[in-house]
Amino acid sequence: MLEKIVAAVRAAGDMIRDAHNIERDTREKTGAADLVTKYDVAVQEFLHRELLGICPEADFFGEEGQHTTLTKDWAFIVDPIDGTTNFVRELHYSNIAVALCCRGEVRYAVVYNPFIEDLFAAEKGCGATLNGRPIHVSGHDAAHAICMCGSTIYDRSYTDRSFAIMRWLYDHTLDFRRFGSAQLD
């Protein structure tokens, strides 16, 4: 199953890697910091077809519409382009993310940055890989090893609370970085 999901996500990656005139085909979704492009929609439509072809008994929940009430045991959860602002600005730090859940529990997950061809894949109980190589937690003390990463929120009314949390994280870890793609961060 994981290999089939990976193949679909890689094919979708070709669509965004080859994108042109991105800014022209962009609109605001909920505000200036929450964008959607024609590529978000096209990638989601492609993944909708491909993933339900792999697992037709699953529901499909995508960020760019096509929301459905999840009534089946299995469900695909899809973010067609995470880091859309980066994508629009042609900063190659965006990704496609797909999870296949069973009764609310993630069983398979894939996060793919097609610009640098980094593909993270995981199957519950089998570990995670980066480009096919197993990855592991380092085992170092968190305060000296973790560079916390985070993303902003679209609702500015949460800014003070969000920054307070970031400050606490900064004080309790090695460093804090924010690159604009929550899943890659």
What are these regions (language model features)?
Residues 1-81:
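N-terminal subdomain of lithium-sensitive/metallo-dependent phosphomonoesterases centered on the IMPase/IPPase/PAP
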Residues 24-27, 128, 173-177:
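Short secondary-structure junctions
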Residues 137-185:
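An extended, acidic
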Residues 70-129:
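DPxDG-like acidic metal-binding loop motif
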Residues 107, 135-137:
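Short, isolated positions in well-ordered beta-strands
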